[in-house]
Amino acid sequence: MRRVDLLSDLRYPKQEVAVADSDTIPLPPVVKPVFVDTCRAGMTCIEDYGDSTRRGMASFYEALDRTSSSHPDHDGLVRIAVFGDSFIEADIFTADLREMLQKRFGGCGVGFVTITSMTSGYRPTVRHTFGGWSSHAVTDSVYFDKKKQGISGHYFIPREGAYVELRGQSKYASLLDTCQQASIFFYNKDSVHLTARVNRGESKNYSLGPSGDLQKISVEGRIGSVRWTVDRADSTLFYGLAMDGKKGIILDNFSLRGSSGLSLRGIPQQMLRQFNEQRPYDLIILEYGLNVATERGRIYDNYQKGLLTSIEHLKNCFPQASILLLSVGDRDYKTEDGELRTMPGVKNLIRYQQNIAAESGIAFWNMFEAMGGEGSMANLVHAKPSMANYDYTHINFRGGKHLAGLLYETLIYGKEQYDRRRAYEQE
């Protein structure tokens, strides 16, 4: 039987629900794909592990924009500190990196120089003479008071009449013959009397009362040379001097022969914070590993723990700085067959260094890979002309220029990628 609805005439017909089209209800927004960083073929790019704390490269890339602007809230300077071992002593590598960056972004001068130096005789980027100082370094085998050390791991005590002179030069690298500002840094518990003589002209006297903070005296002008003489400085510790520009790039070389980077954690926090007030770095580059890697070393757990502590210490004292860790470069040894090979311990250390960068949220550049990887140090040694020494460990100035060029190109490419990503995300 057919079912019949006896009340159908009395019912209101059901209204059909129209299917809404895109004009009546909003569609979900189009999801914008994430910007994908690329790396140019043949280039070893920086691996940025920076997070929301911004200790990767972002802060540095943004700081570079300051060199071409005239914002009243900043001085137009971008400051870079390079901490390392004997691989970069005498301004190897950093001299050419400084020149490349200053040519592009402006700036002049060699930057920070310790009061005395064992490499002053063969550092080509500044003429450095001194006398009358008692020098102390964290790597000394004799007693060293860690509480007194400054940013370079040194402190210097003057005798009456002690002097230090810096003279610009033009034999190696450009933009170093003159600077616009020269400074000296010290900590005095008693009054101090200094004399500054610029360009071998008239002497100018300076007197400062005791202070509990890091002090700085500066002279300005077109400065080709500056000589500081200590007339009286009871209870005063000196740390270094500088030749800088007033705008553009400042790059300071803090090399320390025999260092592994672990001694950075022992520099007093108060001292580093006061240096940060005087020289607020936008980028800190760490170059270590020569004094850590062993021929067959596999386990570097203790080193990883120590360097993580050093990096955290730098983060706390330089809260605005980007931090870039460079891997150890290639280091070769002769096998029993007389063949030159990369130390196995080097490759193991590089894996630890990359983990250190990732765990601390900073940036990492694989210098070993950039050099050419396996056996690349031997290739540099045997190049014509040679770019490294026959210890198959240290580069020379030609090798430094080669590696500086590789890092410079990587930094510029990273900056371009960062700018593209920022523009894309603001569309």
Predicted regions and their residues:
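Conserved, compact domain cores that house catalytic/ligand-binding motifs in diverse enzymes
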Residues: 76-82, 89, 93, 248-340, ...
